[in-house]
């Protein structure tokens, strides 16, 4: 055996620096053809909003041209926006949801 001293001090653990994922907004865009009631139904179904919240978001988009529906991680935002837009297409409406980075 060797006579050299053994260093028994534990090595400090290096924790990887984790960054929060960037957030994205799902935006509802106003159009002049999709019935308000249908928009509210889609908001309730896809984004699990209450009737009142769905109406408020829908009316905000109607008045201002667009409204923030939800802010979440990119993959979730893109999935929800596509699902909601597809429901509009299936019903024959030009309902449009988009995503954009949260600032």
Swiss-Prot record:
InterPro entries: ClpS (IPR022935), ClpS_core (IPR003769), Ribosomal_bL12_C/ClpS-like (IPR014719). It comes from the Bacteria. GO terms for biological process: protein catabolic process; proteolysis. It holds the Pfam family ClpS. PANTHER family: ATP-DEPENDENT CLP PROTEASE ADAPTER PROTEIN CLPS, ATP-DEPENDENT CLP PROTEASE ADAPTER PROTEIN CLPS1, CHLOROPLASTIC. Binds to the N-terminal domain of the chaperone ClpA. Belongs to the ClpS family. HAMAP family: ClpS. Involved in the modulation of the specificity of the ClpAP-mediated ATP-dependent protein degradation. This is ATP-dependent Clp protease adapter protein ClpS 2. It comes from Agrobacterium fabrum (strain C58 / ATCC 33970).
